[in-house]
C-alpha cells in the first residue's frame, strides 16, 4: 500500500493519493501453467477504452476458457477525491508451448465507476514475440 498525504494550511494532513496491490480470488494462479491460448482466441478479444471500458471483453467470459494463469494481480488507485480505480492484470506464460498455442498473453482490465465487473482494456501477446 502506498499513501501520500498533503499538509493543509492549519497543519493537519489530508490523504492526497493512495494505491495498493492486493491478492485476488477471481483467477487461479498456476506457476506450472501450460498454454491453452490460440491466436484465434487472442484475436477475438475486444479491448474497451479507458474512458468506458465496458465495450471490452468481460474477464468472466475469458475465464470460462482460460481459468488458470501464470500470474494475476489486483490493484486499487485513487483517481479523484473519493473515487477509486480498480484494475486487474493477468499474464499467461508458457515458453515451451506446444505448436498452435501461444507462448505469452498479457491482459489488463478496468472497471467502470461504481461497478465491480472487469473489462479488457489492453492486450499483448503473439505479435510481440
Descriptions of predicted regions:
Residues 1-129:
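Residues within mature, well-folded domains
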Amino acid at each position: 500500500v502506498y499513501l501520500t498525504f498533503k499538509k493543509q494550511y492549519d497543519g493537519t494532513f489530508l490523504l492526497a493519493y493512495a494505491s495498493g496491490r492486493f491478492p485476488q480470488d477471481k483467477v487461479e494462479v498456476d506457476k506450472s501453467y501450460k498454454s491453452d491460448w490460440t491466436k484465434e482466441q487472442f484475436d477475438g478479444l475486444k479491448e474497451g477504452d479507458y474512458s468506458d471500458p465496458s465495450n471490452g471483453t468481460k474477464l468472466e467470459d475469458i475465464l470460462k476458457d482460460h481459468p488458470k494463469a501464470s500470474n494475476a494481480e489486483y490493484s486499487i488507485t485513487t483517481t479523484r477525491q473519493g473515487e477509486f480505480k480498480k484494475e486487474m492484470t493477468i499474464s499467461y506464460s508458457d515458453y515451451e508451448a506446444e505448436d498452435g498455442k501461444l507462448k505469452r498473453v498479457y491482459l489488463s482490465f478496468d472497471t467502470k465507476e461504481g461497478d465491480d465487473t472487469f473489462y479488457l482494456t489492453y492486450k499483448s501477446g503473439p505479435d510481440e514475440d
